[in-house]
Regions:
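Conserved mixed alpha/beta catalytic, RNA-binding, or beta-rich assembly cores of soluble enzyme
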Residues: 31, 38-47, 55, 66, ...
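Conserved catalytic cores of soluble enzyme domains
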Residues: 67-185
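Short beta-strand elements
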Residues: 15-18, 120
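An N-cap/entry alpha-helix motif that binds or orients negatively charged groups
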Residues: 1-14
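A structural preference for short, pocket-lining loop segments at secondary-structure junctions
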Residues: 17-28, 45-70
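A secondary-structure boundary/capping signal
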Residues: 27-30, 125
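C-terminal intrinsically disordered, low-complexity extensions immediately downstream
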Residues: 176-195, 200-205
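Short flexible coil/turn linkers enriched for glycine and charged/polar residues
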Residues: 8, 19-22, 94
């Protein structure tokens, strides 16, 4: 039913494109596909996106959405949290920027894995960003929670989101931050090479 409704094989879509002339790999979760829940196929798609970014040396921009792991699919869905986390770590080892752009709602195992691992976190205004539900947390801590608890505004205030950006402005902000990150990375790499060359020179002379 979900495939017929969305014309997709799974909830995750992966694409390539460019922002400000910068080639990127992008991914998004379609909430209309079983509530954006992540099963085995979705995890594979996210990992494929990471591999595409590494193979093509592009930043990875992802738009998470959904209620978490698709547990009726078996523990394989839960294992997707670990697998996607390990994949994002590989992206970071390759020094490629990873930007997570939270959409409404982002919850459960999605929040607790790849969605919260971005170098930069953008969020649309008023998004629900959570792991467990508000009532569950309230019952656990036995305290009153603020009205904006688990919203993108609350997350920004507490350091989990870098900036709240309206969808119409996302392209501009993503382009700006990627330009800064890639320029800085280029300068750092260049500096490291120069430093390495200076360090190697005395050893070269000693060996000659």
């Amino acid at each position: 039913i979900a495939r017929k409704k969305t014309n997709q094989n799974c909830a995750v879509m992966i694409a390539k494109g460019n922002v400000n002339g910068i080639e990127i790999t992008a991914g998004a979760i379609n909430f209309d596909f079983i509530g954006g829940s992540c099963g085995a196929a979705e995890s594979e798609a996210i990992i494929y996106g990471v591999q595409h970014a590494i193979d093509n040396q592009t930043p990875y921009v992802f738009f998470p959405c959904g209620g978490g792991q698709r547990m009726f699919e078996s523990p394989i869905a839960l294992a997707g949290m670990t697998r996607t986390t390990l994949a994002i770590n590989e992206l970071k080892k390759n020094k490629l920027p990873y930007i997570s752009c939270f959409t409404d709602p982002t919850a459960g195992g999605i929040t607790a894995s790849f969605a919260m691992l971005g170098d930069i976190h953008f969020a649309e205004p008023g998004c629900l960003i959570a792991f467990a539900g508000k009532r569950v947390i309230k019952a656990t801590v036995k305290e009153e929670l603020s009205a904006d608890f688990q919203t993108s505004e609350f997350c920004e205030k507490h350091g989990f989101v870098d900036k709240i950006v309206h969808r119409k402005d996302l392209r501009k902000d993503i382009g700006n931050i990627l330009s800064i990150l890639l320029k800085k990375q280029s300068e750092v790499t260049s500096g490291s090479l120069n430093e390495t060359s200076e360090n190697i020179e005395p050893f070269t002379k000693a060996a000659s």
